[in-house]
Design a protein with these regions (language model features):
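Catalytic beta-strand/loop module used to bind and position nucleotide/cofactor moieties
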Residues: 1-102
């Protein structure tokens, strides 16, 4: 939707995106709704947008979606965009890298 950040399917938001810069380090990310609990979403306004609703990959596809498949697909597509080969690291190593960046 014009003027609104994120990814929208019709009038419903399926993905939020954000960026921040602290101490010369950029932080960026997105939140893709795969199979959220919509009862929880009824209690908040997504990104402060009153009267807007969220949707999900599962709701739009009409069947359960495997989170592992989603993660692999996103990693593959991100690798294509950035001309990189996706690699896995454990959580401890990730936190170490993040701390060193601060």
């Amino acid at each position: 939707l014009p003027g609104l950040t994120g990814v929208w399917v019709g009038e419903d938001k399926i993905c939020s995106m954000g960026i921040a810069v602290r101490r010369w380090v950029s932080w960026h990310g997105f939140a893709l709704n795969i199979h959220p609990n919509f009862e929880h979403w009824a209690l908040i306004h997504p990104c402060g947008l009153v009267g807007r609703h969220v949707t999900s990959v599962e709701k739009l596809s009409g069947h359960p979606v495997d989170m592992g498949d989603v993660k692999r697909s996103i990693a593959e597509k991100a690798g294509d965009v950035f001309c990189m080969e996706p690699a896995s690291i454990d959580r401890a190593e990730l936190f170490k890298i993040a701390e060193e960046a601060l």
